Design a protein with these regions (language model features):
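Long, charged/polar, surface-exposed segments that mediate recognition or autoinhibition
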Residues: 101-152
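Exposed beta-strand-loop-beta-strand "reactive/processing" segments of non-cytosolic proteins
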Residues: 51-90, 157-193
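Short loop/beta submotifs within extracellular cysteine-rich repeat domains
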Residues: 43-47, 84-86, 136-144, 181, ...
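C-terminal motif of bacterial Sec signal peptides marking the signal peptidase cleavage site
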Residues: 18-21
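Bacterial N-terminal signal peptides that target proteins for export
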Residues: 1-10
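Short glycine-rich, low-complexity/disordered patches
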Residues: 29-37, 41-69, 138-168
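A short, surface-exposed interaction/processing loop segment used at functional sites
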Residues: 95-121, 185-204
């Protein structure tokens, strides 16, 4: 079971975009098989899956020069180690290569490695992303004046399973709704739409 949320962003400038990704040496798109394979490769390279549990995976398109071009630019990974420490790792596109920063440790909370449920990366695939985008698009098209807009890009995909805080592990056995909430993968994504009659943005 996947709980799904999405946000619509209406923007006023038009730029070229591709929703399925690129091939060869061109930038990776947001939702192609090639992109997802690269994301998983980067995650597994930078996070030891045998020593850590990943509970969050997010990737975003470029928000600068290539905004709305559906170009993969950053990946964020949330994970817990066996000492119940929580980390965030950001992998960013720099000069054509993805570079991992230093993991940022959460000094406020500790999460139970043993009781938290890890994301299954195999559950995240291009078919799922296409289904999510289609459902979000179809829902947007039921809104008033929706035909005045075109879908230009996906700004973000996020998948996560709520990690269990240390001290709350007992609730998994005592509360069925708590167990369901903390073992269910949640998906979230942003769709960017532009108004059809807006003039293209000129870049110099």
């Amino acid at each position: 079971m996947i709980r799904q949320f999405f946000k619509v962003t209406l923007v006023v400038s038009m730029v070229a975009s591709v929703l399925v990704g690129c091939n060869g040496s061109e930038p990776l798109g947001m939702g192609s098989e090639e992109s997802i394979s690269k994301i998983k490769e980067l995650v597994k390279t930078n996070v030891d899956m045998n020593e850590n549990k990943i509970y969050e995976l997010q990737w975003e398109e470029d928000n600068g020069e290539h905004k709305l071009e559906n170009m993969l630019s950053s990946i964020t990974v949330g994970y817990i180690d066996k000492e119940n420490n929580d980390y965030k790792l950001i992998i960013e596109l720099k000069d054509g290569e993805f570079v991992a920063g230093e993991p940022d440790k959460n000094e406020k909370w500790k999460y139970s490695y043993e009781k938290s449920t890890a994301l299954n990366l195999d559950d995240i695939n291009a078919g799922l992303l296409k289904k999510m985008v289609k459902e979000g698009y179809d829902l947007f098209m039921t809104q008033e004046d929706s035909t005045q807009y075109d879908l230009k890009s996906v700004g973000k995909y996020r998948f996560y399973i709520y990690p269990v805080k240390v001290g709350r592990e007992h609730l998994l056995a005592e509360n069925e709704s708590f167990k369901k909430e903390y073992t269910t993968m949640v998906s979230y994504f942003d769709l960017n739409f532009i108004k059809k009659d807006e003039a293209p943005e000129v870049r110099g």
